[in-house]
Amino acid sequence: MSRVCQLTGTRANNGMAVSHSHIRTKKLQQANLQQRRLWWAEGNRWVKLRVTTRALKTIQKKGLGAYAKSLGINLAKI
């Protein structure tokens, strides 16, 4: 399974690690992904998703159904 948020599509970021002597090396900054079982009230069932912690905060604020609808994702297919 790839390291991609199933709701937002967030992926790893290519960055640079800079040492004290300013030597720059490539570094991959991974998304903070969590495997969660979330209750989908409209579908009256649990949905297992791999989401970022940022998406989890938004789900707590808006609700899973409303957030998925705003992103154009059909939870019935998941």
Curated annotation (Swiss-Prot):
GO BP annotation list: translation
Keyword Ribonucleoprotein listed: yes
The keyword Ribonucleoprotein is annotated on this UniProt entry: yes
A single GO molecular function term of this UniProt record: structural constituent of ribosome
UniProt xrefs under Pfam families: Ribosomal_L28
Highest taxon in the source lineage: Bacteria
Keywords per UniProt: Ribonucleoprotein, Ribosomal protein
GO cellular component: ribonucleoprotein complex; ribosome
Family: Belongs to the bacterial ribosomal protein bL28 family.
HAMAP family on file: Ribosomal_bL28
Stored NCBIfam families: L28 (TIGR00009)
Protein name as catalogued: Large ribosomal subunit protein bL28
Provenance organism: Synechococcus sp. (strain CC9605)
Name of the gene encoding the protein in the UniProt record: rpmB
